């Protein structure tokens, strides 16, 4: 992958970067963890960033724990009042895609209680009884028993869909927080030839949803993220400009002299 310089050095020195305030950008697509928040903490300058970007801002995240409503509520508590329809999340969109493809087909969903409830509200049949599909999300309750059940379902012919491929994301302290990709690695350590379909970044699905809702095209959209392998590779594949930032330093420096 091409390694682009981030927009801010670890010691806080700014680098030259694309002007996020330029009117050319009809949509600013932004990653969540490491860019706007870290866990339950809003990063420096992000409230001002969100106010300045306004209606051009779309969150495109490999979050596979929350529904748009649950994440929207958390963000509002952090002073980030971003409308739920602007939160495009890998887990929620994986659930939505399956509910639209075959709503009556049973799906074994390994995910948070929030996402399971979201799937049921969309009419998806969540069941481990002869499912057509196994949907793997960031299930913090994932354990040996869950791994055995997944392996049995795949052996029986179920399709494997993975919300997001990230192995981890950095905590505010810099330590890795396990992600869905780590759970996938456990499956693939036993079934190395297992085929699977990814919904989240770097695949185009989330980017396409954001552009459709924004009513724009890739050449008029800018992706901001801290992960070259997901944010950067996904943007590159669509011909979209990408601006890489250092994880957990916030986005206030991107505003330059803009006032809020």
Label each PLM-derived region with a short phrase:
Residues 1-52, 58, 64, 68-86, ...:
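Asp-based, Mg2+/Mn2+-dependent phosphohydrolase catalytic module
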